[in-house]
Design a protein with these regions (language model features):
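Short helix-loop capping/hinge motifs at secondary-structure junctions, enriched
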Residues: 129-132, 136-137, 157, 249-253
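Short, Asp-centered acidic motifs that coordinate Mg2+ and/or phosphate
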Residues: 110, 147, 195-196
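Residue-level detector of anion-binding/catalytic polar loops
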Residues: 59-61, 175, 195, 220
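Oxyanion/phosphate-interacting regions
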Residues: 1-8, 12, 160, 164-170, ...
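Residue-level signal for inorganic ion chemistry
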Residues: 17, 21, 42, 53, ...
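DPxDG-like acidic metal-binding loop motif
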Residues: 72-131
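Short loop->beta-strand "edge-of-pocket" segments that line small-molecule binding or catalytic clefts
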Residues: 138-159, 169-180
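N-terminal subdomain of lithium-sensitive/metallo-dependent phosphomonoesterases centered on the IMPase/IPPase/PAP
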Residues: 1-83, 255
Length: 258
């Protein structure tokens, strides 16, 4: 399936949203009861992206971080994270990104991640590889303990199982990064800046764009039991658990095999 037109729309929308995020001040408000935040920039960025996608593909379904799902059920679905790393931006930490994924029959076929801070844009089409600054990555094996990133779903901070799993992963790592911006972590992994990424009940909206780019850049995504992770957007949250790393590195990160 030729998705070059959809990819072009996603790239242009993500970069336009990045310009907005980089130049405009943010008004911050609480989001839910778990200490999460939202800003007016989340909403404005999302409105910009959704309007562009809707103008180009009025019949497609769009699932966006702030506004949820809109449009008729169908095989063509867009996932929009207008500001991944809101809490970071709110405290002045320049670690955030924009992510857009286009999916057909529940599988991501095109993905874009834009970093407003560096101005870098990364993209991928399923089966055609990934493009962007630092790609393809030159990754050489290292004997040092792996540098890993961790991501978890919302509302799990007080969950004992989550804490135990995170502690176990950290014990196997040289350093465990919790960036609160999974899209940034996916790009770091795709570029070989980190050795792996572990996700537990990962959030859906920011998942497909980053995972597709990393996979097309040569990253292997495993289930906790070591089997290949089926990169689909219709999996329940309880099954969005993964270990992403380069070939042959799974046992270093997850030596128990599950």
């Amino acid at each position: 399936v030729d998705v070059s037109a959809e990819l072009a729309v996603a790239v242009a929308a993500a970069e336009a949203a990045g310009t907005l995020l980089r130049r405009e001040p943010a008004w911050i408000s609480a989001k839910g009861a778990g200490g999460d935040l939202s800003t007016d920039l989340d909403l404005r960025s999302e409105e910009l992206i959704v309007s562009r996608v809707r103008a180009a593909y009025p019949d497609d379904r769009i699932v966006a971080e702030e506004s949820g799902a809109a449009g008729a059920e169908g095989d063509r679905v867009w996932f929009v994270d207008p500001l991944d790393g809101t809490n970071n931006l709110a405290i002045g930490l320049p670690v955030y990104a924009v992510g857009i994924a286009f999916c057909v029959a529940a599988r991501p076929v095109a993905g874009v991640v834009h970093d407003p801070v560096s101005g870098g844009t990364w993209s991928a089409v399923r089966g055609a590889g990934a493009r962007g600054p630092g790609l393809p990555a030159e990754v050489t094996p290292s004997a040092r303990p792996p540098l890993l990133a961790w991501t978890q779903g919302h509302g799990l901070a007080a969950d004992p199982a989550t804490g135990a799993l995170r502690t176990a992963v950290e014990a196997r790592s040289g350093r465990l990064l919790q960036l609160w911006a999974p899209l940034v972590a996916w790009i770091m992994l795709a570029r070989g800046r980190i050795d792996g990424m572990v996700g537990y009940r990962a959030e859906l909206v920011d998942f497909p764009a980053g995972a597709l780019i990393a996979a097309e850049a040569g990253v292997e995504i495993h289930r906790f039991d070591g089997r290949p992770f089926d990169l689909r957007v219709d999996l329940p949250e309880s099954e969005r658990n993964f270990v992403a790393c380069r070939a042959g590195q799974f046992a270093r990160i997850w030596p128990s095999g599950g």
